[in-house]
């Protein structure tokens, strides 16, 4: 199980991303509209002003039950080994058993 501080850090990043989402999107639209290079550099500077953790690339999908950041299945929101355990225990309807 992931440490609680890491999970809280991830939640903080999600809140920051939601807060600065509109600013980033509007700045990117402005860059595509402007033709002069100097104006593009100014707008690019605005894009760099929000905090780093507000960038969507800094977010990780985490397992719903354990908080593990790797090997997650989007459809279930679970990591691979938890998914396998739950499928074998017949807790996920519609999933077929496999052994690997």
UniProtKB/Swiss-Prot annotation:
Keywords: Chloroplast, Plastid, Ribonucleoprotein, Ribosomal protein, RNA-binding, rRNA-binding
NCBIfam families on file: PRK08881.1
Protein name per the record: Small ribosomal subunit protein uS14c
Subcellular location: Plastid, Chloroplast
Subunit structure: Part of the 30S ribosomal subunit.
Record-linked Gene3D superfamilies: 1.10.287.1480
Family label: Belongs to the universal ribosomal protein uS14 family.
BP terms from Gene Ontology: translation
GO-annotated cellular components: chloroplast; small ribosomal subunit
The keyword Amino-acid biosynthesis is annotated on this UniProt entry: no
Highest taxon in the source lineage: Eukaryota
Keyword Ribosomal protein applies: yes
Free-text function comment from the UniProt entry: Binds 16S rRNA, required for the assembly of 30S particles.
MF GO annotations: rRNA binding; structural constituent of ribosome
Pfam families in the cross-refs: Ribosomal_S14
């Amino acid at each position: 199980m992931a440490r609680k501080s890491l999970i809280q850090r991830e939640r903080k990043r999600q809140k920051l991303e939601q807060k600065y989402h509109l600013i980033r999107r509007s700045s990117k639209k402005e860059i595509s509209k402007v033709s002069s290079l100097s104006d593009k550099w100014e707008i690019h500077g605005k894009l760099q002003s929000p905090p780093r953790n507000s960038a969507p690339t800094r977010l990780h999908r985490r397992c719903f039950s354990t908080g593990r950041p790797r090997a997650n299945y989007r459809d279930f929101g679970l990591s691979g080994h938890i998914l396998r355990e739950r499928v074998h225990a017949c807790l996920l309807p519609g999933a077929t058993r496999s052994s690997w």
